[in-house]
């Protein structure tokens, strides 16, 4: 059935309405906020929001800079997404459900001091201060594709080090089969927690071999500086061959467990968001196709969508981990 585009979707280059690509609870929450914002516009608040977003047009001159050489193994022969788009078009529901909410509202997050507890099935459990994490292993810049399950993508220059470096130091036991990542859930810092969208705190997980894969990056920076709050400060994980929601933000716990851990979106809608959630153009979301994507900042209404690559283009690095698996069943 042909779905008629809304004007907003057409201008954004979307092929389907936001109500079709957004979980119902999130869509209804956004609609209530937009209705309230209509009244605020008369008082000039919309202009203030615009000024807040304009502050992210270029890297923050006051933000802590990170010296990290580019790793030539991890580059993408595509245009890097602008700093403005990377920092103003985000999903981070702890700060709101609209794409601009994190940039406008994440100033309440306090990324320092910050501690990450590494626990569970490890011989050397430890609580890392964020400054200690910065020094745990040599930092490097990697340019990765980011593919959102909603059908859009970016190309981002992240800074961090392989998660495997941390894993080796804590020495997982033979019982450690999975790694769980838990995000901060502090209502005083995260106003979006008041919305009953997910069971907070946000959590994600990887199989142990996925966590140890050289691509999996413990990430503390972007565009030569520490992570902005809205991008998951002060530490997150990046798993570039999976849909973006697998890359947990603002991590406070890394837990090694003996069985597949519950994860937020898979718990919310297991028929829509699989535990693995590998980028796969051959396995559609129940409500939309995953065969193509829109590149943020480049692809508009009159630009044909680009084809989505299997494993987001990282098959040489990761395909062997899923050999013999039915990827339609284990999506």
Swiss-Prot record:
Cellular component GO terms held in the UniProt record: periplasmic space
Enzyme class (EC, first level): oxidoreductase
Q: Which residues form the signal peptide?
A: 1-57
Q: Which CDD domains match?
A: YedY_like_Moco (cd02107)
Q: What is its main location?
A: periplasm
Q: Tell me its cofactors.
A: Mo-molybdopterin
How, per the record, is the cofactor bound?
A: Binds 1 Mo-molybdopterin (Mo-MPT) cofactor per subunit.
Query: What EC designation does it have?
Result: 1.8.5.-
Report which residue ranges the record marks as coiled coil.
none
Q: Where in the cell is it found?
A: Periplasm
What is catalyzed by this enzyme?
L-methionyl-[protein] + a quinone + H2O = L-methionyl-(S)-S-oxide-[protein] + a quinol; L-methionyl-[protein] + a quinone + H2O = L-methionyl-(R)-S-oxide-[protein] + a quinol
User: Function of this protein?
Assistant: Part of the MsrPQ system that repairs oxidized periplasmic proteins containing methionine sulfoxide residues (Met-O), using respiratory chain electrons. Thus protects these proteins from oxidative-stress damage caused by reactive species of oxygen and chlorine generated by the host defense mechanisms. MsrPQ is essential for the maintenance of envelope integrity under bleach stress, rescuing a wide series of structurally unrelated periplasmic proteins from methionine oxidation.
Please give the family membership noted in the entry: Belongs to the MsrP family.
Q: Which HAMAP family match?
A: MsrP
According to UniProt, the name of this protein is Protein-methionine-sulfoxide reductase catalytic subunit MsrP
Provenance organism? Burkholderia mallei (strain ATCC 23344)
